[in-house]
Structures are given as structure tokens and as C-alpha cells.
Amino acid sequence: GAADMGTGCDTTLAQIAAEVLDCPLDNITVFGADTDTSPYDSGSYASSTTYVTGKATEKCAMKLRGQICKLGAELLECTEDEVEFDGKDVFKSKDPTQKKSLSEIAYASQFGHMVPLEATETHTSPLSPPPFMVGAAEVEVDTETGEVKLLEFDACVDCGTPINPNLTRVQTEGGLLQGIGMTLTENITYDKNGYPEENSLFQYKIPARTDVGKIKVEFESSYEPNGPFGAKSIGEVVINTPLP
């Protein structure tokens, strides 16, 4: 139910599910914005998608994994404690040659059983562990005109354990650019009648990548036990840091 607005959450949520189910990422399909197939989600905002929706995804995948093991154990005529699942087969721990493939288990769930293999979970976090970030900017200032040129911005972020380091880095770089634009170039003014004078992107100047110098991003890894695989959020913190 979480909408991917450019943050890459469809990929991140698929990675979480694939990790739990021990399957390739290509085996996971995300219906992120289809109310006919996906459950209600509070929205992709407030630094909550990976931390909250990601945890719901992890819990849901764990429940589905448990159902797979349970049905596999029934087909193998043993208890759940006696089997393991490697993403392809459910097999007996003491005799791996006795196994049932995932396709066999899926077939059995549709024929001869009243309930198919499916799971639904909800998650609300009792905590909101903050991410941390430090930033340093090198600027060049024209003392006569007041023009400020950003030469380099260095950032180090603690967002727990990044689920997808590449997407996390891009999210950080994009957020930094938004914060830099808010600080240096973006402004709204109003005429005497109260109408905004910046009514298009020709007047409202947002920075392009070529308007800033080097942007360097590093991560200080930590582990948040309440997040999916140790992840925390990384949304507002990367926008807010350049502002001071």
C-alpha cells in the first residue's frame, strides 16, 4: 500500500520480503498503489516507509514462511519443528533427501486445503528512533554581491542498517539538494494583492545538480532492533541538515 514517490520503496520492500523467504528478488511483485490488491497504508511520508511498512512486510513474510513450513511438514508427515525451508524446498532437518518443493506445496495449498498460502500483517511502532546526521559545507562567498557558491557538502548519516545502500545514498543526495535549494535559491514572494509572484519553475529557482559542487555521503552503520533488519528512517533528516 505504500506509494513509491521516487524513494525506491518498491525495491526496498521487495528486498525485505525476498530476504525472509530466501528467494530471488525477481520472484517478488509489489503492488504499491493498487487498492484492489494491496492493503491500506498510512502513506509514504514522515520517514516511515522503510521503518514501519518495511517491518510490516517482514512480519507478513515471516508468517507466510511459517505457513509454507507447516504445510510442507504435513505433506512430509512430520512436525514443523522437524523441517527447514531454504526458499526452494521444505525438507526434514535430519534427512534432507525427504523434501517437498515450493511448487508442490503451493499446489497442495490450492487443492485439498481450505486455506491457500497467504498472509496479512499490520505494524505500528511503539517507538520512533531518530536517525542522526552530520553535515559540513564548504562555500565561496562574494563579499560584494553576497552570492554564495557551494563548493562541497560532506554528510555522514546513521540510519540504522541500510536495506539498500545505493537507494539510501541517492535518497540522501536528493534530500541534501532539496535542503540546499531551500537555503540558497528557493523563495516565494507575494504582490500587493497577495498573489505569489513565483508561479512557475522559471521564477521559483530549484537547484540543478550542476548548481552545486561535490556531494559526499558516508554512512555510520548501527542496528535498530525495532526496524526491519536493523533499519531506521532516512527522510527529513537529510533535508533538514543543510538548512542551518
Protein language model annotation of sequence segments:
Residues 15-244:
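C-terminal catalytic domains of large/alpha subunits in multi-subunit enzymes
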Residues 10-11:
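Conserved strand-to-helix beginnings and helix N-cap segments that scaffold or border functional pockets
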